[in-house]
A protein has these predicted regions:
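Flexible "arm" and connector segments at domain edges
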Residues: 1-106
C-alpha cells in the first residue's frame, strides 16, 4: 500500500472513530507522547518497540493528512537532500559544509 493511501485510511479511521481531526496542537502532543512511549519501550528492552514505532508512524501520517501534506513526497525530497549533503568532522561534531551552521552530533 502506498503511503498516501495509508494516510487517507488513517484519517478515515480517525473520522469513523470520532478521534480528533481539527486540533493540530493536540495531535503534536499525542505524537510526542508516542515517541516517549517508544523510547521507554526501547530503554526497558520491551518487545513492543515495533508496535510503538508503528504508533508514531500512524500519528505522523494522520497529522500529515490533517495538514494536507503528502508525506511520501516530502520524505522522498528530504532523503534526496540528505543524500546530497556534505559534512565535515570538526572537533568530534559533524558540520554541514553549506551555509547552515547547525551542527549534527555524531
Amino acid at each position: 500500500m502506498k503511503m498516501k493511501e495509508t494516510q487517507k485510511e488513517i484519517y478515515q479511521n480517525k473520522l469513523d472513530k470520532g478521534f480528533n481531526v481539527t486540533d493540530v496542537n493536540k495531535e503534536f502532543c499525542l505524537l510526542y507522547g508516542e515517541v516517549a512511549e517508544a523510547y521507554d519501550a526501547w530503554r526497558k528492552k520491551r518487545e513492543t518497540v515495533g508496535e510503538e514505532l508503528a504508533d508514531i508512524a500512524i500519528y505522523l501520517m494522520g497529522l500529515s493528512e490533517i495538514l494536507g501534506i503528502d508525506l511520501e513526497s516530502e520524505i522522498e525530497k528530504k532523503v534526496a537532500v540528505n543524500r546530497d549533503r556534505v559534512y565535515q568532522l570538526v572537533d568530534g561534531v559533524l558540520r554541514k559544509t553549506t551555509d547552515d551552521p547547525t551542527p549534527c552530533q555524531r
